[in-house]
Swiss-Prot record:
Gene name of the record: SPRR2B
Protein's name in the database: Small proline-rich protein 2B
Cellular compartments per GO CC: cornified envelope; cytosol
Compartment(s) where it occurs, according to its Swiss-Prot or TrEMBL record: Cytoplasm
GO biological process assignments: epidermis development; keratinization; keratinocyte differentiation
Organism this protein belongs to: Homo sapiens (Human)
Ranges of compositional bias, category Low complexity: 1-11
Region (Disordered): 1-20, 42-72
Chief localization: cytoplasm
Region 3 X 9 AA tandem repeats of P-K-C-P-[EQ]-P-C-P-P, residue ranges: 21-47
Domain of life: Eukaryota
Positions of Sequence repeats: 21-29, 30-38, 39-47
């Protein structure tokens, strides 16, 4: 038997098993920024008393002559 044949008869060696690369630790989940506090609703305006469209009519003052009557 030649040297070559002997080598061929050797059982094939399985390829060396590569050690599985260690997975890098998974990143910790990103920290969620704290949720914004709910926006503070501006306080509702106090209910407005019904405003009359027109200001109340003030009684017109009695007519006054522009000029006082000339005393004779």
């Amino acid at each position: 038997m030649s040297y070559q044949q002997q080598q061929c008869k050797q059982p094939c060696q399985p390829p060396p098993v590569c050690p599985t690369p260690k997975c890098p630790e998974p990143c910790p989940p990103p920290k969620c920024p704290e949720p914004c506090p709910p926006p503070k609703c501006p306080q509702p305006c106090p209910p407005q008393q019904c405003q009359q469209k027109y200001p109340p009519v003030t009684p017109s003052p009695p007519c006054q002559p522009k000029y006082p009557p000339k005393s004779k």
